[in-house]
């Protein structure tokens, strides 16, 4: 992928950009084989790639500069700003949004936050696009609620320029730290969730719910999990760390009993909305800690699907799964190193299938899906 920002030495986020996508995929596949050394794998499925550019559905922009000339991008460690509006990972549809937002910031009087001086209001812009209908969600991350009245007053102009903005919020992040968002979310539109659809499954994106940033590859990941579960005798399933329910909603059938657990209430609200649209009455989603939920249950499902953050599921949950001994475990991971550690804590399971998904091109990161069967 050609990138003017990389060529100019202004951005090094895509550290593997000089390698072809095939070379990247080969290196990632070799890394996964290395991490699973000593763990017999019955079936290595072909690695799945995707587009090398314009694939991201989300932009996270630090706002710097002045209110008259704001700059969207990132800050180097020395505080030097870099404009990332031309990043080739973003779809072409983002450019007109960035262009309209620059004069809007002046209209609304949203002074960019100055890290060195600890002054200003606008810290970040978070933009998400739906691949389903092109609708967008825009979040203004502010230091305080001081400029909310001005922001609301200026919004009609912005919405006239950008009718694709379906959900607009102000997130309040008062702490002087590199934290992307705060706990308080103030909706500035009637619509509060962005509609998305993968493989004919309705999904919803809310401001504080995690959603994969590479829709093309994510849809194939969910479809693969659905196909694997469809070949197994599963009538009762848990979906732990379920997020907005992508895995569970793909895998569920009208006859299946499924419980999805996720700590974030916003994500659970999305999952419940999707289940209602699909008419799946035996799906139950709850906002709980996944480990605490699992270890408090007395019944054993046929299959447990886990999709933890980078730290993995950890030894306590591994030990409980080993004791509970469901017939099948599907492990989706964005960190194969912690996944391999967790699998080694499940000695009574064999690896039936493994498949790598290149969710993060031009970096060393990837997603992996693993099917474990009880011995």
UniProtKB/Swiss-Prot annotation:
The active site is at residue 334. Keywords: 4Fe-4S, Iron, Iron-sulfur, Metal-binding, Methyltransferase, rRNA processing, S-adenosyl-L-methionine, Transferase. PROSITE patterns: SAM_MT_RNA_M5U, TRMA_1, TRMA_2. Coiled coil: none annotated. S-adenosyl-L-methionine binds at residues 212, 241, 262, 307. [4Fe-4S] cluster binds at residues 3, 11, 14, 87. Its EC number is 2.1.1.189. It catalyses: uridine(747) in 23S rRNA + S-adenosyl-L-methionine = 5-methyluridine(747) in 23S rRNA + S-adenosyl-L-homocysteine + H(+). One of its GO terms (biological process) is rRNA base methylation. One of its GO terms (molecular function) is rRNA (uridine-C5-)-methyltransferase activity. CDD domains: AdoMet_MTases (cd02440). InterPro entries: 23SrRNA_MeTrfase_RlmC, MeTrfase_TrmA_AS, MeTrfase_TrmA_CS, SAM-dependent_MTases_sf, U5_MeTrfase_fam. Pfam families: tRNA_U5-meth_tr. PANTHER family: RNA M5U METHYLTRANSFERASE, TRNA (URACIL(54)-C(5))-METHYLTRANSFERASE. Belongs to the class I-like SAM-binding methyltransferase superfamily. RNA M5U methyltransferase family. RlmC subfamily. Catalyzes the formation of 5-methyl-uridine at position 747 (m5U747) in 23S rRNA. This is 23S rRNA (uracil(747)-C(5))-methyltransferase RlmC. It comes from Salmonella schwarzengrund (strain CVM19633). The gene is rlmC.
């Amino acid at each position: 992928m050609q990138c003017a920002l990389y060529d100019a030495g202004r951005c090094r986020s895509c550290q593997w950009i000089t390698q072809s996508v095939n070379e990247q995929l080969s290196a990632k596949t070799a890394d996964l084989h290395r991490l699973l050394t000593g763990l017999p794998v019955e079936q290595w499925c072909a690695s799945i790639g995707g587009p090398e550019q314009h694939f991201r559905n989300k932009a996270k922009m630090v706002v710097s500069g002045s209110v008259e000339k704001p700059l969207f991008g990132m800050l180097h460690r020395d505080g030097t700003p870099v404009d990332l509006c031309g990043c080739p990972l973003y779809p072409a549809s983002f450019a007109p949004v960035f262009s309209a937002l620059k004069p809007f910031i002046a209209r609304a009087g949203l002074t960019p936050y100055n890290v060195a001086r600890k002054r200003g209001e606008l810290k970040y812009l978070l933009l998400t696009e739906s691949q389903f209908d092109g609708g967008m969600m825009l979040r203004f991350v502010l230091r305080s609620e001081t400029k909310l009245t001005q922001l609301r007053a200026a919004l009609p102009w912005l919405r006239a320029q950008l009718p694709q903005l379906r959900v607009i919020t102000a997130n309040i992040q008062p702490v002087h730290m590199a934290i992307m968002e705060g706990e308080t979310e103030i909706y500035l539109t009637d619509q509060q969730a962005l509609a998305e659809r993968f493989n004919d499954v309705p999904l919803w994106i809310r401001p504080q719910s995690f959603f994969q940033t590479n829709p093309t590859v994510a849809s194939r990941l969910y479809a693969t999990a659905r196909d694997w579960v469809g070949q197994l005798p599963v009538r009762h399933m848990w979906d732990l760390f379920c997020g907005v329910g992508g895995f569970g909603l793909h895998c569920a059938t009208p006859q299946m009993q499924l419980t999805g657990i996720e700590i974030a209430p916003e994500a659970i609200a999305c999952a419940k909305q999707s289940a209602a649209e699909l008419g799946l009455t035996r799906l139950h989603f709850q906002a709980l800690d996944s480990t605490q939920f699992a270890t408090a249950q007395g019944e054993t499902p046929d299959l447990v699907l886990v999709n933890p953050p980078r730290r993995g599921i950890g030894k306590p949950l591994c030990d409980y799964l080993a004791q509970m001994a469901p017939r099948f475990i599907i492990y989706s991971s964005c960190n194969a190193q912690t996944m391999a550690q967790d699998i080694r804590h499940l000695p009574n399971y064999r690896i039936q299938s493994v498949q790598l998904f290149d969710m993060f091109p031009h970096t060393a990161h990837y997603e992996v899906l693993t099917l474990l069967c009880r011995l």
